[in-house]
Swiss-Prot record:
Recorded name of the encoding gene: plsY
Transmembrane segments: 4-24, 53-73, 80-100, 116-136, 138-158
Quaternary assembly: Probably interacts with PlsX.
Classification via SMART domains: G3P_acyltransf
Protein name: Glycerol-3-phosphate acyltransferase
One GO term describing the cellular component: plasma membrane
Biological pathway: Lipid metabolism; phospholipid metabolism
Domain of life of the organism encoding this protein: Bacteria
Length: 220
């Protein structure tokens, strides 16, 4: 392993440590996603807290955190066997960001970004699987879990030299989804559909609570 490869691994981790969800939330005045909603700093939770535009920006930035270092390493002619580990470093940065007290996301979007340079076939297989499961089930977490379970198989069939790092990524993401898996088994996992309505109901409830407390204070 060359010094350039080690440098790229470090840079990939540091880039991954830039939490898009937290930064976008701060800029747009949204609540900190680590302390609200599902407490996960990712696009899905930002969607719950702030709407589609902010969530889309977070999603694109998270994907870019995975794609950019792998493409740059490929451009610098780093050996293919190390490209996958550079992608793993980017995902580790997203999951355990050094700049945000190691409280990161679950790494799905960043992992998708690392797989995009493998080829359009791989990217299409991963995105297609996620979309199909999401549309059929309505569960973002279930779509992510099934996609990462199938990703090593897709990689083995398309570019087997990347199977090991993709398998490592899949294991990391599954571990990060252990709470979602438990909620899915209990039937307590919220669906994507209807989240905005649920959020509006919660806001109305909070406004009612504030009004009630104000009335009680006025009576005193």
């Amino acid at each position: 392993m060359t010094a350039l490869t080690i440098l790229m691994i470090i840079l990939a981790y540091l880039g991954g440590s830039l939490s898009s969800a937290v930064l976008v939330s701060r800029i747009t005045g949204l609540p900190d996603p680590r302390d609200h909603g599902s407490h996960n700093p990712g696009a899905t939770n930002v969607l719950r807290l702030g709407g589609r535009v902010a969530a889309l920006v977070v999603l694109l930035l998270d994907v870019l955190k995975g794609t950019a270092p792998v493409y740059l390493a490929w451009y610098l002619q780093i050996k293919p066997v190390y490209l996958g580990f550079i992608g793993v470093a980017a995902c580790l940065g997203h999951m355990y960001p050094i700049f945000f007290h190691f409280r990161g996301g679950k790494g799905v979007a960043t992992a998708l970004g690392t797989m995009m340079p493998i080829g359009f076939t791989m990217g299409g297989a991963v995105i297609g699987t996620w979309l199909v499961v999401l549309l059929v089930s309505g569960y973002s977490s279930l779509a992510s879990i099934i996609t990462v379970l199938l990703s090593p198989l897709f990689t083995y069939l398309i570019k087997p030299e990347y199977t090991l790092p993709v398998s490592l990524l899949s294991c990391l993401i599954l571990i990060r989804h252990h709470e979602n898996i438990a909620r899915l088994l209990k039937g307590e996992e919220p669906r994507v559909w209807g989240r905005q309505a649920q959020r509006r109901q919660e806001e109305v409830g909070e406004m009612d609570d504030v009004a009630q407390k104000r009335d009680e204070r006025d009576k005193k």
